[in-house]
């Protein structure tokens, strides 16, 4: 038992988890955010390689990188749904999409969806941001499980996950995450 435990500790100390955020565009330019989990010695051995791909952010021990990636995508998904809901409502009040985007991005409601996705992928109706809806659901599902495990109250993560899963049922396979706006619009 002691030998097995020592072997597991040794293996654990040689691994890192390093998921990324930033999509294809930032991968091409080497500007990804790399969320690294693992011990400092192991991370320092691969730091130079990771820095070529983007900005290394140390999340914590082994596994923290993957937890951070899931939590990041949950926050992104919640912002996405809120932004889509607000844009849809603004249009019903006669607010032009471009005015909505400009005002939100100059105010406290600004987020990645309002800055990057609304005009380029939603208002244009291209819906091709390059991140599959099923992958967003996977990450939000993991985040929801993490939140459930650590806290007794998690109403928003449950609602975000349910909304994305329902959207996936309507939109089908190979849907881009920006297509969720189509569901909300109808």
Model-derived regions, located:
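Short beta-strand and adjoining strand-loop segment in the mid-core
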Residues: 26-47, 57, 71-79, 87-93
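Helical "substrate-binding/catalytic lid" subdomain
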Residues: 64-184
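Short strand-turn motif at the edge of the Rossmann-like AdoMet-binding core
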Residues: 19-20, 39
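Single conserved hydrophobic/aromatic residue that forms the stacking wall/gate
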Residues: 1-11
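Conserved catalytic-site region of short-chain dehydrogenase/reductase
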Residues: 23-26, 65
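Short low-complexity, flexible loop/linker segments enriched in glycine and/or proline
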Residues: 8, 31-33, 114-115
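General beta-strand structural signal in soluble alpha/beta enzymes
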Residues: 14-18, 57-60, 156
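A charged, well-structured terminal subsegment
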Residues: 47-58, 134, 140
